[in-house]
């Protein structure tokens, strides 16, 4: 009990000293620097790193039994980035490809959502996608992501394209995946993939 009283007394004494010094009521003695009036330096705020993620999801018919798990995997990537420490300035965009309901003149690719920090909207758009036949032009999807997304101009920005599908990436008759990836790399964009299928497959 005496120890607690002593600790409390010391704490109150420290508080009183702190208040007394901060008011500057007493002038410092001659020749003694007025250290009480020195303003402590404030730590500089750490700039938030921009992270831009473009999701390219295969919505062709062959993904019918796989698309739900693909969406879950992609959303797990979004959550992992969003929960990083320190928290990044995260924006996510969405592209679908390989769906017969899309314009064939574009190579059956469509930008569903530009880069946005509204992750609720990303979730709604992602999980609303459905499958419907089609040709899977992976290179065209990567190219659309590079050309149509409003990528950050910040030199510190991390720019990523995630392609998720289950078919060979060689179906595009106009653009090869190598060409699409090289063009992305030239713009400091990293291209990653999630394969939806058996691990023993040649496409894995």
Region spans (language model):
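Bacterial N-terminal signal peptides
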Residues: 9-18
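VWA/integrin I-like adhesion module and closely mimicked acidic/polar interface patches used
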Residues: 167-204
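Surface-exposed acidic, glycine-flexible loop patches that form ligand/cofactor-binding
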Residues: 28, 40-48, 81-86, 146-157, ...
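Bacterial N-terminal signal peptides that target proteins for export
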Residues: 1-8
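Sec-exported extracytoplasmic/periplasmic mature domains
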Residues: 71-86, 99, 124-131, 143-154, ...
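Von Willebrand factor
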Residues: 46-164, 169-170, 197-203
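Acidic, polar low-complexity linker/tail segments
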Residues: 18-54, 60-68
